[in-house]
Regions:
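The conserved beta1-alpha1 loop
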Residues: 123-125, 264-265
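Alpha/beta-hydrolase
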Residues: 121-123, 240
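C-terminal catalytic histidine-bearing segment of alpha/beta-hydrolase fold enzymes
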Residues: 261-322
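Primarily recognizes the serine-hydrolase "nucleophile elbow" in alpha/beta-hydrolase
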Residues: 201-254
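Active-site machinery of serine-nucleophile hydrolases
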Residues: 119, 126-190
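Gly/Ser-rich "nucleophile elbow"/oxyanion-hole loop immediately N-terminal to the catalytic nucleophile
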Residues: 115, 169-217
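Short, proline-enriched alpha-helix->beta-strand connector loops that line the catalytic pocket
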Residues: 151, 254-260
Length: 322
């Protein structure tokens, strides 16, 4: 059986995924990769960027795709599937130390610069929780790029516990939830995360005036929730596509003196998410908060970035295509 390793790799100007297959056929032609999400009418092709022979193995670089779904990599007449994958790697992860402290599982990038430094807290989205301290980094590759772009910052990326059944409830139209209990970005877990940051401030490692928070989807909701868990800790927040519930909507409308910039889109898997975000930002602006901003991407703008917005795609097909 061939040894298959899988990596998340930043290439020139784009981010993709790479396979390394030992004892694969020497023939480099006819290499294809397709996804087969449950319920999909037909397999979805994924672009193969390059195929090279290196050190007795094939190196195959592709566009990004949801590697946790069902995929088939074909090299001539040979097929390889997710079930045969032996190893998952994240290029660039080595700069992040794996830590578990005071009930919080997290990755931490430490800058070489001395003295109190800024800190950026990143909260992952739904489906990327667990206890391996790698899934949230592999799925949200931006964490690696943060360390490259903001090399003078501390970058903290905790992983929340997760259970099946949380996401469907979270994605119900404007569902009521306060994320209590041990799962997701609950107030209790966020409090423990913030305690670690305050400990780093007390130790002189972090500049108390330059602590920032961002997150995507469930992590975007966690970003808003973190702003209310420890008032005054964060200098600014950037929630990306934050999940909207009555609780997070109330928090958003109450951030009258906070600096925040929300990014979201009309095309979303949660019904009317953007409507409540727009209402919340407009309420803040009407209340005099000129530091509350919103970027709302249109389908045309998303398409310009290569993001599939075809309304005929099923939800799972759209996720896989992106």
């Amino acid at each position: 059986m061939s040894n298959i390793s899988f990596s998340h790799v930043p290439f020139a100007g784009w981010t993709g995924l790479g396979f390394s297959i030992d004892h694969a056929p020497a023939e480099l032609s006819d290499v294809t990769l397709t996804l087969s999400p449950r319920g999909a009418a037909a397999p979805i092709p994924v672009a193969v960027r390059s195929v090279t022979a290196e050190g007795g193995a094939l190196k195959i670089e592709t566009d990004e795709f949801d590697y946790r779904g069902n995929w088939v990599l074909c090299i001539g007449d040979d097929k390889y599937t997710r079930a045969e994958m032996d190893e998952e790697q994240v290029e660039g992860l080595e700069v992040y130390e794996s830590r578990q402290e005071d009930g919080v599982l997290y990755r931490l990038y430490t800058p070489e610069a001395k003295g109190p430094r800024p800190l950026l807290l990143f909260l992952h989205g739904g489906g990327n929780g667990g206890d391996d301290n790698i899934t949230h980094i592999a799925a949200d590759y931006g964490v690696i790029q943060f360390a490259e772009r903001y090399s003078d910052f501390y970058i903290m990326a905790p992983q929340a516990m997760e259970r099946k059944g949380v996401l469907p409830k979270m994605n119900a139209p404007f569902a009521e939830t306060d994320q209590t209990g041990p799962y997701g970005w609950s107030r209790a877990y966020l409090g423990a995360v913030c305690d670690l940051i305050r400990k780093m401030i007390a130790e002189g490692k972090v500049d108390a005036r330059r602590v920032y928070v961002t997150g995507m989807s469930m992590g975007g909701a966690g970003t808003l929730r973190a702003m209310s868990v420890v008032a005054g800790l964060f200098a600014a927040a950037v929630p990306v596509c934050p999940s909207m519930t009555p609780e997070t909507f109330r928090i958003l409308c109450g951030l009258k003196h906070s600096k925040l910039w929300i990014a979201t889109a009309y095309v979303d898997h949660t019904i009317y998410r953007h409507k409540y975000i727009v209402d919340g930002i407009m309420a803040l602006r009407d209340a005099g908060n000129q530091n509350a901003h919103l970027t709302l991407y249109s389908p045309e703008e998303l398409a310009a970035f290569g993001i599939a917005t075809d309304p005929d795609l099923t939800l799972k097909e759209r996720f896989s295509a992106n």
